[in-house]
Structure formats: C-alpha cells, structure tokens
Curated annotation (Swiss-Prot):
This is Large ribosomal subunit protein uL14. Binds to 23S rRNA. Forms part of two intersubunit bridges in the 70S ribosome. SMART domains: Ribosomal_L14. PANTHER family: 50S/60S RIBOSOMAL PROTEIN L14/L23, LARGE RIBOSOMAL SUBUNIT PROTEIN UL14M. InterPro entries: Ribosomal_uL14, Ribosomal_uL14_bac-type, Ribosomal_uL14_CS, Ribosomal_uL14_sf. The keyword NADP does not apply. SUPFAM superfamilies: Ribosomal protein L14. GO terms for molecular function: large ribosomal subunit rRNA binding; structural constituent of ribosome.
Length: 123
C-alpha cells in the first residue's frame, strides 16, 4: 500500500537508492498503489555517476510491498520492504539493466515483461 510521501527502495541499477512517492497515477483521487501500479516519484538518495540524480522526477512501477499481494487461492505474498523499478517518463521503459531481489507474478503483463525477464526470481 503505497501512498504519497511513502519512501521506497529502488530495485534496479539506475543509480537511485531511495525514492519518495509524490503521486499515485490512475484516477483523479486515487490514494493507494499496489504491486504493478505506476507511481510518480522523486529521487531522495542516489549514488555518484548513476544514470539518475537526486531531485529527478520520474515514473516507477511498484514491485514489492510490505502490505503484500493476495492471490486467488488465498495465499499472500509479503516482503520486508517497499521497492520499485524506475521507468522513463515518456516511454515508460525500464531505466536500469539489472533488477535486484524477487518480484511477483502480478507484473506479468505485456507492459512489464522486461522486468520479469531481468528479475532473478519471480514469486
């Protein structure tokens, strides 16, 4: 459950370490984002010589949440931290070339197959 002002870890090698959600996209008064949703973020902490820098405003897709994802069989997949993967603002393509940590099967639609293929583990 990601909302405005939520701090997230970054699960790719784009150069950002911590980001903050500034808007949940998809509806005029949408409050929460879940796994697979696109959010608008600003970078709060970045490494030197990365592809992005502190203060950049980008889009990101949520790949892990502490709240978890409920499956149709009743099971719930939860993670220890909230994490996202950064996307290009215009084309919504993945900025990084590697994904760190597991991602959920809920990302498996045409838009995020790139994230699924780069991820080391799909739960």
């Amino acid at each position: 459950m990601i909302q405005e002002q939520t701090m997230l870890n970054v699960a790719d090698n784009s150069g950002a370490r911590r980001v903050m959600c500034i808007k949940v996209l998809g509806g005029s008064h949408r409050r929460y984002a879940d796994v697979g949703d696109i959010i608008k973020i600003t970078i709060k902490e970045a490494i030197p010589r990365g592809k992005v820098k502190k203060g950049d405003v980008l889009k990101a897709v949520v790949v892990r949440t502490k709240k978890g994802v409920r499956r149709p069989d009743g099971s719930v997949i939860r993670f220890d931290s909230n994490a996202c993967v950064l996307l290009n603002n215009n084309s919504e393509q993945v900025i990084g070339t590697r994904i760190f940590g597991p991602v959920t099967r809920e990302l498996r639609n045409e838009k995020f197959m790139k994230i699924i293929s780069l991820a080391p583990e799909v739960l």
